[in-house]
């Protein structure tokens, strides 16, 4: 008997688990197929979650009802807030994961999720009828039927591991690769590219001389990614910092001809922002040293991840490199680093919902779309799961805008501009980063998560209470006047402020750079009554109000452009005045509105003006008809 589902998810990595959970939580009967049930949510590369921009994505996933934040909060070994000396727009949380515990916890969550069924199996082929996906067929001939399919295959598609002059078929960490499915996508007509990533060696902690390294402890206060987390892990493990040196660089230089990067063996394009150590040596040969972070892979293992030493050099050369690094001179290498090449689809073949333009009800998410990183994959998986379930159940799809979330920036960049290298999310990619902060992800997205059925009534009630407290406190401070008496003058001067000449509203005093919410309470002789996150919002929203309002005005302009819709079936070849490049790019991307069209590389303002005139003439023609 053939089994039938609403949604099938191929793969159970970081994109797959979020896709499967989101689909099931929206009420779709969902099947998740994975090559190995023991490797659900596996971390084949760095054992960490978060960091600049990426940490904000994890918060956004949580605000929309996803899982990554909750799981890392329960399984991390260290957590740090980054960029605390900078403005709120670039602050981000980063956690070191216990990679085994993370896997185990995520597997437990998936197994317990209602509507989500899990099966070990390798998908070889999509079942397609009239350009619409109808299900999948495995390598042993089993068929599963469904109304939608989400492909989240990571680096498994025609994966090949490269080490020195050796190259062999493999998924990450020497797992089985998926070869036939990649062939099937080519046969269906998808444009496929070849990308590359890599990983460093792991060493035995017992053989590291930590006295020659610099300790990197976690924060000594409770931190969490999830807005629902109330219990914090304070028993943390440190990371350690060391550096390469002239000796290390000589080993690389002497053996560069053995690197697959420079021998011509690697054909795929590697990640710009996570280069191998040999690539760093060649590209930045003026630098006398490069940072290396020694990151424990968990509480119950001695394996330490040497971040910054990603390499495809032969194993014996990797040992020689380690012997030159302070603290690692006698380190026992437990796993060698390697490079991995894999197939990815050109992401401009997708709609902003992550549904493919070529095959109806077929979605893709994660590294198959040309991205790098667990967080980028998880964000895409979440949206693909939300949209696939929404489409088949007729409960609505959702497209995040660039002003809604970093996830929106990520997906818009992929489907509008494409990428010729593994895409990494950066704060600099977001034009509204003051709006897309770590601290306000819930204020931006919880309403949306609730409307999509991803947020519980209890959580939504708590969120609304928080929002009301923020608004009420800002209003209260706007009604209180602080008088320039000796008490207030002394406190203000003590904190580096200038004396008051006249009375001032508490909210206006808080806008001064040297003032904080704590100081305002001191001036008012009041105790703390609100939660720290409410107080933080009051301070940030007050201090940055002018800048935030300017950003919101820019958002409104873009929204007006987004309201100018473009028909999906518009034939750009009939618009004679368009430049040839613009016509080709617009035909390829098929933008949904003028705002998206304006972001396509090769489409200039003159082309947009021509397109607007053409659309307006079309409307007038329809009215006259």
From Swiss-Prot:
Cofactor: FAD
Residues that, per the record, bind FAD: 11-16, 123, 178, 367
Localization per Swiss-Prot or TrEMBL: Cytoplasm
GO molecular function per UniProt: flavin adenine dinucleotide binding
Record keywords: Cytoplasm, FAD, Flavoprotein, NAD, tRNA processing
GO CC field: cytosol
Entry keyword annotation includes Signal: no
InterPro entries: FAD/NAD-bd_sf, GIDA_C_N, MnmG, MnmG-rel, MnmG-rel_CS, MnmG_C, MnmG_C_subdom, MnmG_C_subdom_sf
UniProt: NAD(+) binding residues: 270-284
One Pfam family named in its UniProt record: GIDA_C_1st
One BP term from GO: tRNA methylation
Chief location of this protein within or outside the cell: cytoplasm
Organism superkingdom: Bacteria
Known role: NAD-binding protein involved in the addition of a carboxymethylaminomethyl (cmnm) group at the wobble position (U34) of certain tRNAs, forming tRNA-cmnm(5)s(2)U34.
Family: Belongs to the MnmG family.
Subunit description: Homodimer. Heterotetramer of two MnmE and two MnmG subunits.
HAMAP family: MnmG_GidA
Name of the protein this chain belongs to: tRNA uridine 5-carboxymethylaminomethyl modification enzyme MnmG
